[in-house]
């Protein structure tokens, strides 16, 4: 799939390719050149003008609108905050909880989408872990069977960080909306890679430093318009409380949109980079990006499976993503740590992870700018090492 007019253009946009093959976007991504240039341009202007120089707020509004377009939301429903855990904590700490309220969560989720909810137990909130057969294997039927009359909110991730299985977001969200249960989504593992619609979602948080190809601590928080008066900001400052001419008032009146969750100065340099990366991905086409990620993952699986490795998610799973994670199925084969170290020596960067049972995992997460030829290089390197 041709996303670039030439190989030179691909290398210029992603200079990391001139040094190594980076396949760890599900961790912390490398930045495309457009993001670096946007951040440098902002910083260079800051040397000559104040940091809130002319054009900054236009850039912020454009980023808000672009984020809304990615999610199918309104710009008034978007706060520009990162990291992901900040947005999730704003939801957990902003609702008016009552003792006995229930929150359903996935105990084998990434920690950022576990601890904000566990912390609510201090207020008498009851936490119910989904009884999933395997990490990330969540269906609408499984969620519905866990609901009770006391269930207030369900907190899940759009894609599991280890298995790579995506969540059937619309199916679960539609069911929860019909039952009057709030739905909060950690979307960092799909936003920028796979369609992530908030049509049936109430709250969403995602930093840009993975599939959005943006910098760390620049992110997107979505709060459905109808719920903004219910979700009280837990962080207050001069920016999200109405303060005419920066004069403190005798009462607290919040900004009327999702800006009420932005208490102070924004991460403007990060937002500049995030906006540039989002525009780059928008130009490539979200649907085409998804197809490319599935093709890259399928090539890896097909080439590595004959070598005796076991994958956490079958290649024919309809909810597969750009994450491909494998483990050693033979006691005689090399450990994942050794395979990962060999690849690193050969200029290929992956992610060594640990399963919830303590076993070694090797995770591949290429992005749209990678090629099938590069995936074959990975297969060939591992085959030579294991042979």
Which positions does each model-derived feature cover?
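Pyridoxal 5′-phosphate
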Residues: 1-387
